[in-house]
Amino acid sequence: PNSGTEYDPLIYKETYQWLKNHSHDKKPWFLCTSFVNSHDIMWFPVDQKWFWKKSPEYTKKTRLNLEKRKWGRKNNLPGFDLNIPEYLSKLPVNFYDDLNKKPNVHRVWMDSMLKFSRPGYISDKNEKLWLQQINYYLHLHVLNDYYLENLLHLIQRNNLFKNTIIIFTSDHGDQCGSHKLRSKGSWNYEEIMKMPLYITTPDMNFSQITKSLSSHIDLARTIIDLAGGSDRQLEKFEGKSLTRLLNDCLLYTSDAADDAGS
């Protein structure tokens, strides 16, 4: 819980300093920056300090359970007490789905998640709390957007776009009440399966969009291929290189977007 808000500022500072020190290196380099958030959403609402006062016994049992996990932290439940803005004022329409009409795995997984992870129970009738969960999720993204924006500005100031490949992606989403579910679960809804994947290379001076299906297993081959790796090097990895999609997909230049009415 709260590992994103605890560690992401440190990850950002180390990344920023590393880029400042190595931006002009003559030798090619590879840098992977992995922020934790928006993963903190998994622990809502037990990671909120107001919840501790409202449900002290539940919080106490959760804290004892978390203390058994050797994460190397002084406090495995430090708590989140920043203000959460109201980005949205309505729940998604599919929040009102009936889980009794869905596959049994939905209910079984939710029950197990609440029992063993103990993130805090949210009543179906407490729509205000479900909405707060979504706004918390969005706020975690906003916090990380600040770091990403600063890193991109640094890349621009150091004129790195001319010789640097940048890839942005994530591992999974969160239901946050969509289909009346929480967390990443064991289902194939768009909210957790449709991940952002942006690739920018020095050779691209226009935007391209593709609806082609890809997977995280394709990333290693794609990175090696973009870096000019040999076929022998590529054969060591599973998946497929996505470089073909950069040249063979739906193409939108600014003129084309205008013509399409975008």
Residue map of PLM features:
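A short aromatic-rich beta-strand->coil structural motif
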Residues: F30-T33, L197-Y198, I223, S262
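Single conserved hydrophobic/aromatic residue that forms the stacking wall/gate
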Residues: Y252-S262
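Active-site-proximal cap/lid insertion segments
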Residues: H24-D25, F35-N163, I167-S170, D174-L213, ...
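Non-catalytic, well-ordered alpha-helical segments in soluble enzyme domains
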Residues: P202, K211-D248
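Active-site-proximal alpha/beta segments of enzymes that process anionic O-linked groups
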Residues: P1-K27, F35
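FAD-dinucleotide binding site
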Residues: F30, H179-R182, T243-D248
